[in-house]
Structure formats: structure tokens, C-alpha cells
Design a protein with these regions (language model features):
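E1/E1-like adenylate-forming module used to activate ubiquitin-like modifiers
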Residues: 1-86, 114-125
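Oxidoreductase and adenylate-handling cofactor-binding alpha/beta cores
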Residues: 88-102
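Short linear functional motifs in flexible/disordered or boundary regions
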Residues: 13, 102-103
């Protein structure tokens, strides 16, 4: 299941429910900040399966509390490319889990940073 919600409250309810039902899921999220009139952005893809779930809570990988102050996100239509990247990374992760694509790292958490054009893979199975 792909999880792409834009409110913390929905995510805080949905993630425990998926875990309770022992369902695998891939959660996507964006984080934006504005510094000197330039956008900084992070794209996050976090995978949780019945066999590998500890990282989600131990490392707070999926935001389940805090503010829904996303005015910056809602006011910047130009970040559609970041949404597309989140979706693309999630589909690639799904295909790796299903054995279609090779997965040499076995990561369950990936973050892309716009300012340095970096992909960081963590939480290996």
C-alpha cells in the first residue's frame, strides 16, 4: 500500500492501523523550508513490512506528531516535480520488494535533498 497523505493527524491514525493489520506499506512525504527566498526540500520514502518495522518508530521515520503548517507547500505549485519524485521512488522501492528490480542495499528509508542533489539510504533490512 502506498501512503501519501498531507496531514499529520491522518498519518498518525493510519500508520498504526496498517501495522495492527500487519500490512506492508510505503509512506512518502515532503519537507520544505524557505531560506533567502529559495526553497529547500526533502523527499522521504519510508517502507514498513511485517518483518521490518522497528526503524519507523525507533528513528521516528514517519511524522506522526507536530504541526500541519504546510502553507509553504500549498503556495508553491512548482514543487510538482518533488511529488513526482516521491511517487517514482516509492514505485521503485515496491518493485525492489517484489523482486522486479535488484536491491543491493535493502534500504527501508530513503531521503532526497534538493540543495545537494543527494539520495541517502538508511535502515537496511
Amino acid at each position: 500500500m502506498f501512503v501519501c497523505v498531507d496531514t499529520v493527524a491522518v498519518r498518525a491514525w493510519l500508520i498504526p492501523e496498517l501495522e495492527r493489520r500487519d500490512l506492508p506499506f510505503i509512506d512518502c512525504g515532503l519537507g520544505l523550508s524557505l531560506v533567502d527566498d529559495r526553497l529547500f526540500g526533502l523527499v522521504r520514502v519510508t517502507t514498513s513490512t511485517p518483518a521490518v518495522r522497528g526503524h519507523v518508530h525507533a528513528h521516528h521515520r514517519i511524522p506522526a506528531s507536530g504541526s500541519d503548517n504546510d502553507d509553504l507547500y500549498r503556495s508553491n505549485i512548482q514543487v510538482a516535480d518533488l511529488n513526482m519524485l516521491a511517487g517514482t521512488l516509492a514505485v521503485i522501492q515496491y518493485k525492489q520488494l517484489r523482486g522486479f528490480y535488484a536491491d543491493g542495499e535493502g534500504e527501508y528509508h530513503c531521503v532526497y535533498a534538493v540543495d545537494g542533489n543527494h539520495l541517502v539510504n538508511e535502515d537496511r533490512a
